[in-house]
Amino acid sequence: MEPDAKSPTPGTTETPRELATADILRVMELLPHRYPFLLVDRIVEIDGDSSCIGIKNVTINEPQFTGHFPKVPVFPGVLLVEGMAQTAGAICCAHTLTRDTRPSRVYLMTIDKVKFRKPVVPGDTVEYHMRKLTNRRTMWWFRGEAKVAGTLVAEAEIGAMLVTE
């Protein structure tokens, strides 16, 4: 990837505000997940370590639609929660970008207050709106909402732990 205003220059430090968006290649640098479990296609906004908006384009080609459900495909709610968690993980990784320190993993630790409001179907574009509630050392807590066309489809509170090996 060629350096641009949104990418860090090799060998330099990047502050949280410098990473404002991320295409799929940048998302793959931030997160360890890969197909079929990478559930964030793009980051359209990162505001320091306080909030982030991730995008997931849902297509019928995804493996979960083979069995969930063949005649009426619905994107599994647990994958909406995982997408929120991955978007939160992008906040953690983007915030800690420096030459010397970066978490090697961000582990999902807690999921609370989960509600599924409306089904998500192939053709939908999901926006994951994540907001940091607080953090203590390596533990971070977030409030998330998944929206399709501005309509709330799911919400959750998520706790994560950053691990540096």
Swiss-Prot record:
One of its GO terms (biological process) is lipid A biosynthetic process. GO terms for molecular function: (3R)-hydroxyacyl-[acyl-carrier-protein] dehydratase activity. The keyword Cytoplasm applies. The keyword Cytoplasm applies. Involved in unsaturated fatty acids biosynthesis. Catalyzes the dehydration of short chain beta-hydroxyacyl-ACPs and long chain saturated and unsaturated beta-hydroxyacyl-ACPs. The gene is fabZ. NCBIfam families: fabZ, PRK00006.1. It comes from the Bacteria. Keywords: Cytoplasm, Lipid A biosynthesis, Lipid biosynthesis, Lipid metabolism, Lyase. GO terms for cellular component: cytoplasm; membrane. The active site is at H68. It catalyses: a (3R)-hydroxyacyl-[ACP] = a (2E)-enoyl-[ACP] + H2O. Its EC number is 4.2.1.59. This is 3-hydroxyacyl-[acyl-carrier-protein] dehydratase FabZ. Belongs to the thioester dehydratase family. FabZ subfamily.
